[in-house]
A protein has these predicted regions:
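Conserved S-adenosyl-L-methionine
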Residues: 122-133
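Hydrophobic, well-ordered beta-alpha structural blocks that scaffold small-molecule cofactor pockets
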Residues: 134-218
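Short, contiguous strand/loop micro-motifs
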Residues: 102-104, 151-152
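Aromatic-acidic/polar surface patches that form glycan- and anion
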Residues: 109, 127, 179
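Conserved SAM-binding loop
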Residues: 2-98, 105-121, 138-140, 184, ...
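Alpha-helix initiation and N-capping motif
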Residues: 57, 113, 131-132, 194
């Protein structure tokens, strides 16, 4: 039995089914489909038993304010033999690529390989998606309180900010390509007065002819 917590629209659960896996379940309050195996709710301590062989968290843990407590709820609802597969953005990649747009309000926590692995006594991890994400497999019965060791400089994005500000000071017409979280984060930082960007381009038809929260046309 596989349970994906935070399964979104159910794409990954459907992919697993197509690959031949059986007994796949999910949790997500935003799910809009009609799969009876997906519970339209947040997973919480009220779910006492999910009896899973594998629990999957794909791009969920970085949105959880208290990740250790959340993992404890999952541990309490499963057996000692349950495995957990976690995928999160890799903070080391963010730092190396100066990808400051990947730091935004929806992410409560950031993980590198050392920090993520510290949640468990033993864990196997690797970098995926061009080293942008971390994928880790562990046993839930080996969950432990993590330790944090800060090893990053405070001003790692300072030079990137300076270069962008220098470019923006040229007063050339600008268009935002992509009206999702990264584009909005860019505007939050560099266009607080809503004067630099004329409009936004986005491939999502549900966004077109509407506005992002800055009042810019899409």
């Amino acid at each position: 039995k596989i349970v994906e917590i935070g399964c979104g629209k159910g794409y990954f659960t459907e992919l697993l089914e197509k690959r031949g896996f059986k007994n796949i379940y999910g949790f997500d309050p935003a799910y809009e489909g009609d799969n009876p195996n997906i519970t339209k709710d947040y997973f919480s301590e009220k779910y006492k038993s999910i009896n899973a062989d594998l629990v999957i968290l794909r791009h969920v843990l970085e949105h959880i304010e208290k990740p250790y407590e959340f993992l404890t709820h999952i541990q309490n609802a499963t057996s000692k033999d349950t495995k957990i597969l976690i995928e999160v953005p890799d903070f080391e990649w963010i730092v190396e690529n100066r990808a400051f747009w990947d730091i935004f309000y929806e992410h409560c926590n950031y993980f590198d390989a050392t920090f993520l692995s510290s949640f468990f006594k033993n864990a196997t991890s690797k970098k995926v998606f061009g080293t942008q994400y971390l994928l880790m497999l562990a046993s839930l019965d080996e969950l432990r309180k993590p330790y944090v060791k800060h090893r990053y400089q405070k001003n790692i994005f300072k030079e990137s900010f300076r270069n962008i500000k220098d470019f923006l000071s040229q007063n050339t017409p600008l268009v935002l390509w992509g009206g999702a979280s990264k584009g909005v984060t860019l505007l939050n930082i560099f266009d607080k007065n809503r004067q630099l960007v004329e409009y936004c381009i986005d491939i999502n038809p549900k966004k077109q002819n509407k506005f992002i929260h800055f009042g810019k046309d899409i």
